[in-house]
Amino acid sequence: MTLEEKKEQVKNFRPIDDTFFEVLADDIGVCQEMLRIILEDEKLVVKDVIVQSSERNLYGRSVRLDALCILGNGKKCNVEVQRSNKDHHLKRVRFNASVITVRDSQTDDKFEETIDLIVVYISEFDIFKRGRVIYHVDSVIRETQEKVDDGLERVFVNTVVKDGTTISEYMDCFLQKEVDNVKFPKLTNRVHMP
């Protein structure tokens, strides 16, 4: 493949594509802007990002994370992008979260020291088919419907539903080959073609 052919191929990448997302996620500013929008927290700070982190498991399946962000409040946030709808996505999120949690634990840790983790799962389809751009999946006590805080937040976002919200507008940018939106300056600076 010639250099010109490679340049043409790169022009077709969109933020939802794994290869391009890896490049975007390497920019702390892009990750911070994205998470502030998705998690609806204007004060959220991303201190560090580890892109394509391989979490090894000597006894079974390992996992490769798209982006693992370390937040200013000490929480970790795993961001995954998924185009294919040929998987059990809830179990994938559960598996990834468990691997990250185990990898971050020490032999003598008390369970109260278990990390707080957010998993943001961005998909090119509406995983729950309920017509929402964002879903928060919580642990609840079935009998009382009370939410239980076990330190894991699961947030599913998609690029399909267009509901007029800022999150929906941002997710629509993930489908574009070129982004030019003043509301999202960090993403625009990385994806805009001059």
Regions found by a protein language model. Give the residues of each.
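Elongated, amphipathic alpha-helical interaction scaffolds
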Residues: M1-P194
